[in-house]
């Protein structure tokens, strides 16, 4: 079995899930008998021989580089890996698809690109692109019927027939997020609704409910709610939460065939990514789906899994992570948005 792994520089690698003993051996580079001494490099020009402004600037940069010393070469990966493909922009998500015996790797990046590549061993072959996003893409999701859902910094989710690189539907997630915040009284007075931005932090597909209709759950960064959409229906059911949604897991129980375990931010105030809350709330919330399709909090599951919601804090060996460090770990999707006038 193979793991697909990507780095922020845009490269996607294949790694073995269970390496063989030979592959687990860390390859140590051969140590040279004597380290080659590198002579100090000196620019031939000096401040006495350079007169033009451009040349003086070049000389200054050369002298700065000499002061830093020679740059060390990048240390190679010391484990079995295979480079499959690369983007020229920061890569943000990867999904794997298999259709009629043929595999595909679907990747998204900060530059609004969705790329469809063949799977192993032909990942270097590009089948096509899904163009349409105007802001960064942060999440991809494949539905049971084979549709691709993408979202990021745009006002809409995009639903694709990715095999034909065709856009099928756009879902107005920004309006749903803003309405949820207004319902909970979390929109400050004077906020310009037209300029309100969202950042998609999670996309999850729900198992089909016997009606062959694709359904997805959506989380937006800094929003204390989950949004439940059905393909072809622009209306969203929103699940209000006690804190900002961080992650979702799905389980089945003898009582309920579909339950959600939702990790929430119990450090920051609901609807905020900067203000620290002064009340205590559990780290997890539990919801089960009713026969009418509605989601209600499930006290039975909450009791059964209470140890997870109020578990022991992680041991940080005395290191106190500052509030800004915690915030940067929890909220980093909006940072993908390009600012006017900023370098890409």
Can you say where each PLM-predicted feature lies in the sequence?
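Conserved strand-to-loop turn within each blade of WD40 beta-propeller repeats
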Residues: 6-9, 107-111, 151-154, 220-222, ...
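WD40-repeat beta-propellers
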Residues: 12-17, 114-119, 157-161, 227-230, ...
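C-terminal scaffolding/assembly regions of large eukaryotic complex subunits
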Residues: 224-225, 230-344
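Fungal intrinsically disordered, low-complexity polar regions
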Residues: 16-79, 180-181, 186-190
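Short C-terminal beta-strands that terminate individual repeats in beta-propeller domains
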Residues: 82-86, 126-132, 169-173, 193, ...
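Canonical WD40 repeat/beta-propeller blade segments in eukaryotic WD-repeat proteins
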Residues: 1, 86-98, 131-142, 177-209, ...
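Beta-strand initiation motifs
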Residues: 21-26, 68-80, 121-126, 166-169, ...
């Amino acid at each position: 079995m193979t793991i697909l792994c990507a780095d922020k520089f845009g490269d996607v690698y294949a790694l073995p899930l269970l390496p063989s003993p030979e592959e687990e051996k860390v390859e140590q580079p051969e140590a040279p008998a004597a380290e080659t001494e590198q002579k100090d490099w000196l620019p031939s020009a000096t401040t006495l021989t350079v007169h033009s402004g451009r040349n003086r600037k070049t000389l200054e940069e050369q002298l700065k580089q000499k002061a830093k010393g020679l740059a060390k070469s990048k240390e190679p990966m010391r484990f079995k890996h295979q480079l499959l493909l690369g983007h020229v922009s920061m890569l943000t998500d990867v999904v794997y698809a298999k259709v009629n015996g043929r595999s595909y790797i679907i990747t998204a990046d900060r530059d609004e690109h969705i790329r469809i590549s063949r799977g192993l061993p032909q990942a270097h072959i590009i089948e096509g692109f899904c163009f349409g996003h105007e802001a960064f893409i942060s999440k991809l999701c494949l539905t049971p019927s084979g549709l691709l859902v993408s979202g990021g910094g745009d006002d809409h989710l995009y639903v694709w027939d990715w095999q034909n690189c065709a856009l099928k539907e756009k879902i107005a997630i920004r309006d749903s997020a803003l309405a949820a915040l207004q319902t909970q009284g979390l929109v400050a007075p004077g906020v310009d609704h037209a300029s309100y931005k969202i950042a998609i932090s999670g996309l999850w597909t729900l198992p089909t409910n016997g009606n062959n209709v694709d359904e997805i759950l959506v989380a937006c960064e800094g929003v204390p709610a989950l949004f439940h959409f059905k393909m072809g229906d622009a209306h969203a059911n929103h699940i209000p939460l006690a804190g900002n949604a961080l992650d979702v897991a799905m389980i089945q129980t003898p009582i309920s065939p579909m339950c959600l375990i939702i990790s929430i931010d119990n450090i920051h105030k609901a609807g905020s990514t900067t203000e620290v809350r002064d009340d205590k709330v559990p780290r997890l919330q539990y919801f089960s789906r009713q026969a009418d399709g509605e989601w209600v909090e499930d006290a039975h599951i909450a009791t059964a899994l209470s140890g997870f919601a109020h578990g022991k804090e992680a041991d940080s060996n005395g290191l106190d992570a500052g509030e800004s460090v915690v915030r940067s770990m929890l909220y980093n999707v909006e940072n993908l948005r390009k600012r006017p006038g900023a370098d890409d």
